[in-house]
Amino acid sequence: MIAGQKKRASDVVKELLEARGHDVTVWESTEERIMQLPESERAAAIANIYAQKQPISNLTDHYDLILNLVDVNSGGTVQRIVWPAAKGTPDQPFYVHEIPTIVVSVQHAFALADMPQVGTYINAYDGKDNTMKALVEKLAGESNFTGVSPVDA
């Protein structure tokens, strides 16, 4: 399958969670929204990027849990999470002490170094459909997480 046609891990997890009756919102980053604008409107949107900042109550009043899927290209020359320029938006995990937050790393086992403030970190090692299915089953308590990450132990 051509990589461009493959579903993102976040889309697969969203479908699996919704099939179990959960309400799921996938955050579209500020940068992604700006890139979808007509080119003539992008400069003004970039100049206004800090207006995207919002109070923590906008998150705590609407969400019970944040599941942050980190999909870093493990074959790239730089294997780090790249935080967008927008400050105070859900793009950056500033909310980890106000909302239960789980980080799941797919493709790359070393993302914890970029998010040490997160209390729950899971290495899924890949974003394949069957791995995401097993992840959701484990999050639902249908089977136990076992083992210790050889990377972050």
Question: Model-derived features: where do they sit?
Answer:
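C-terminal non-catalytic regions of proteins with extracellular/luminal or membrane-system context
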Residues: 1-153
